């Protein structure tokens, strides 16, 4: 009997962990049915993750272009105007951590004011440790980095790639 109860507890716990993971997983769909999967890290940046989820759930990121893509550095998006000068949502206080800006790190863009992040974010193509402790890391690409590598380069790129659809995995229909 104890074995059955223990087994049931393990199964139930695994199901709860899976649901929690979906709540903290972001899907970014790009052209050609390519998907980028990001593990969001509310343990590092709870306010930033909450804002990203809110904007994704409101459809605010759908159709937004990658307006600044620097080869060997990063791909930046999240400005509804596509210029790099705009943003959505409230200004967020910095949530800097010791999390490194390695390949696939997802971090918030901001002005010179550390407390100015809103909706723009970038994905690192390679280690960018010079950003550590100065920008808020809120996630990491866990799948689809090969698609990020193919995003059109430029500042701004001509005919830029865009995020077709952005959704929290817990809300995804597919």
Label the predicted regions.
Residues 5-11, 15-174:
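Cyclophilin-like peptidyl-prolyl cis-trans isomerases
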